[in-house]
Amino acid sequence: MESGETLLKKLDGKLSGLRGRLTPDTGMDKITWFRAGGPAQVLFQPADEEDLSSFLKAVPEEVPILVVGIGSNLLVRDGGVPGFVVRLSAKGFGEVDQVSETQLRAGAATPDKRVAAAALEAGLAGFHFYHGIPGGMGGALRMNAGANGVETRERVVEVRALDRKGEVHVLSNADMGYAYRHSSASSDLIFTSVLFEGTPGEHEAIKQAMDEVQHHRETVQPVREKTGGSTFKNPEGTSAWKEIDKAGCRGLRVGGAQMSEMHCNFMINTGTATGLDLETLGETVRARVFENSGIRLHWEIKRLGLFREGEAVEEFLGKF
C-alpha cells in the first residue's frame, strides 16, 4: 500500500475545497476500541453532510472509500486500509434533536447512549436498550443493533444517506431491509442521520429501564476492557456464548487477544494484541465451535483492511 501522501498528490486539486480534515497514514489503532490494526491510507473527517457530499463527488470511483463511526465494532488488519477512511465526527454528525412530540432525529455519529439519554429527556419510551450498546448510530442502523429483546428497526421511521456519487437518498424502514443484526440497504450508502419514532412514557419508568440495562451490562460484560462488543451473532436457537463455552474457549488466548472470562462472546485486547491476533483468535473459536457442535458462528464484528505483507495467516482463516 502506497503512502497517504502519494494518494493525496495524485488527487491534487480535487479536494482543495473541502472543509473537513484530511490526514494521511493515520493509525486505526487510535480510532477503534480494540486499539489494534494498521493505518488508514488517508483519514477524512467531513465537516458536515454537504462537505461529505463534495468529497464523494470529488474522489474517483476507483479509489476505495470506507466509512467508520466511533470504532466500537471494528477489527482492522495490520496491513492497514487502502484508500480513504471516512470518519463521521460528533461535530457534524453527532447531534440528536426532538423534532416532534414523539420523534427524534439523530446524526450517524451520535453515540447510542446519547440517543437513550435524549429519549429520556423527551419522555419517550422504547430507546432504553441503546443505553447498553457501545456504539454509534451509523453502525446501529447498518447492523440493526439491539439488546434486551429490542432492535433498532422497531424505532426507525426513515434514514438519510449519501451514495458513492454524493447524492442524497431517504430510505423508509422497509427500504432498510432489516433482519437480525442485518440491513440489506446497499453497502455503498453512507448513513448520515435517522428519524426515530418513540412512544410517550413516564420519566421514572424509562430511567428504571435504562438503569437495569446498565446494571446488567456492567455485571456480565467486560465494559472496562479494550473490546469491540459481541464478537459473533447468536445462532438460531442458542446463544453464541453458550456454544463458545461448551467448546472450551472461555479465556482462550492468541498472543495479546483473549476471549473474556467474564463473557466469552467478547474478545478483548489484553494490551499487546495485533489485528492478526484478534482475527486468528476469532477464527480459532469458530473452528472449535464447529468441531464441537456443528454450528457455524458468524462474525458480528466487522473485519476490514489488508493483512500485513509477509504475515503468516493460518490455513483455516475464513473457512468457517
UniProtKB/Swiss-Prot annotation:
It is an enzyme of class 1 (oxidoreductase). GO terms for molecular function: FAD binding; UDP-N-acetylmuramate dehydrogenase activity. Its main location: cytoplasm. The keyword Membrane does not apply. GO terms for biological process: cell division; cell wall organization; peptidoglycan biosynthetic process; regulation of cell shape. It holds the Pfam family MurB_C. GO terms for cellular component: cytosol. Its cofactor is FAD. The active site is at 181, 230 (proton donor), 300. It comes from the Bacteria. It is found in: Cytoplasm. Its EC number is 1.3.1.98. Pathway: Cell wall biogenesis; peptidoglycan biosynthesis. It catalyses: UDP-N-acetyl-alpha-D-muramate + NADP(+) = UDP-N-acetyl-3-O-(1-carboxyvinyl)-alpha-D-glucosamine + NADPH + H(+). Keywords: Cell cycle, Cell division, Cell shape, Cell wall biogenesis/degradation, Cytoplasm, FAD, Flavoprotein, NADP, Oxidoreductase, Peptidoglycan synthesis. PANTHER family: UDP-N-ACETYLENOLPYRUVOYLGLUCOSAMINE REDUCTASE. HAMAP family: MurB. Belongs to the MurB family. This is UDP-N-acetylenolpyruvoylglucosamine reductase. It comes from Brucella anthropi (strain ATCC 49188 / DSM 6882 / CCUG 24695 / JCM 21032 / LMG 3331 / NBRC 15819 / NCTC 12168 / Alc 37). The gene is murB.
